[in-house]
Amino acid sequence: MPHALLASGVRLYYEEYLPVRSSAGIPVIFLHGFMLDRRMWTFQVERIGQAHRSIFVDAKGHGLSDCPESGYGRDERVEDLLLFADILSLERFHLIGFSMGGSTALGFALTYPERLQSLTLVAAPLARHRFFKWVSRLDTIAREQGADVAKKAWLNYIMPYYAPAELHEVGKMMHQMIVDQPLAVWNDPLRGKYHTESDNERLQQVSTPTCVIAGDKDRVFVEMAAIMNERIPSVERHIITSSGHMVPLERPELFNNIALQFLERTSE
């Protein structure tokens, strides 16, 4: 199994796919959401992975990557991504991030813009947004009642939001993925204490061509997508109809078309 060994000693698991009929071109890195892993990109492997060199990486504490005691804040994830790209000798790349991965991707674009060819933010949250206030309740549960209780609370809360009842197969996939995730993130003694500067006033500093995607039923993220659309200088926004939070799984064909067209336009 391929792992990238970071200078910190943490190993990140990843899977890489090369296009069948063309040169590899500029690679694409995919970042998954919280309590998920590379498997959430299943339908992108089938389509985007055939057109572009595509790398799907598990964040630490997720999937098959290592689970250190601490170091799960956004700034830490940004540095992990830099080290990961250096290990794979990726001088410049496209970056697609979903939810937590979108936050990481935005942080990376603000810190290391020279490494990015394009930026795609899917159902991505803005740091310090009011959305995170309810997450702090889970941090309290983790500290007072234990990581296992917090993970179950997250699962019970998020499943109806991630996968509505009518999307039975998506729901099964999501449930299993969340159940499979380690408890390390919840056990982090610094959980809830990482400081991340508000993104709102920094969005104008994003110099990378950006594509913002959200599902029309994902109201709070549609709101954040509107803020990004207003403030990021070079940006396009797509609101996917009949979709909630899990756009890449709920509307894979439409998502793939939008992502591929954006990758093609920004690869020149």
Question: What are the residue ranges of the model-derived segments?
Answer:
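Catalytic active-site module of serine/aspartate enzymes centered on a nucleophile-bearing elbow/loop
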Residues: V235-E268
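Conserved HGGG/HGGXW glycine-rich cap/lid loop of the alpha/beta-hydrolase fold
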Residues: V10-S70
